[in-house]
């Protein structure tokens, strides 16, 4: 049977976000869902107001509403983003994506290829 999915920017998984360590990440969430949502930046040290935990660090973004996340990416690494509002349903429908914070130019060892795999199970 078909699975109804929800996607960030119309895709599942959401688009890979790639920034350099020390850069400011700015993302505007425009909620096209039939319910409130947020974005939580899993594993990143972010200001409290940017953490995406509804009713704790921010009000949930209502259907048709928007919220701009903006914060400096202090730590290099591989992270992911996902909602913290009605997480079982929203994650289960595909709302997640990869966030890569790269080290400064020349700091990382050279590699032949850099590939991101983000797996999810809808059933």
Residue map of PLM features:
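Histidine-centered copper-binding motifs that mark active-site loops
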Residues: 1-123
């Amino acid at each position: 049977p078909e699975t109804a999915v929800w996607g960030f920017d119309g895709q599942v998984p959401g688009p890979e976000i790639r920034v350099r360590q020390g850069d400011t990440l700015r993302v505007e969430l425009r909620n096209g869902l039939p319910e409130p949502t947020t974005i939580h930046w899993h594993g990143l040290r972010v200001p409290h107001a940017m953490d995406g935990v509804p009713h704790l660090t921010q009000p949930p973004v209502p259907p048709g509403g928007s919220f701009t996340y903006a914060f400096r990416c202090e730590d290099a690494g591989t992270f992911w983003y996902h909602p913290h509002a009605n997480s079982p349903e929203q994650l289960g429908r595909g709302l997640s994506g990869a966030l890569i914070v790269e080290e400064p130019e020349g700091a990382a060892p050279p590699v032949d290829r850099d590939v991101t795999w983000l797996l999810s199970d809808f059933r």
